[in-house]
Amino acid sequence: QLAEQYPPHPYSFSYDATDETGARISTSESGDESNSKTGSYSYQTPDGVYRTVNYVADATGFHASIDTNEPGTKSEAPADVTINANPIEVKEAYAFKAKSAA
């Protein structure tokens, strides 16, 4: 037996939070009566590295655009995704062992 089908109903939601390290994450999405979805999600680290993904999901498929400054990224457009990269330079971090007390 098939479950009863209901037509799509418009909706929207969002949240924005900052964790104990200072990293920020957020998302939002809305859907309409034609079952199309539009939304975004993002994060930003305390040192300024960020990524934002904006998307549309509809009868033609899932289409995303990504804005980022993550190290090692480059601007390109594979498949149906556009990546707008502006990578930042990362300074290497070094760890030193403490000398033991003699």
From Swiss-Prot:
GO cellular component: chitin-based extracellular matrix
GO molecular function, one term: chitin binding
Modified residues (Pyrrolidone carboxylic acid): Q1
Top-level taxon: Eukaryota
Gene3D superfamilies named among the record's database cross-references: 3.10.50.10
Presence of keyword Transmembrane: no
PANTHER family: CUTICLE PROTEIN, CUTICULAR PROTEIN 47EF, ISOFORM C-RELATED
Protein name per the record: Cuticle protein 10.9
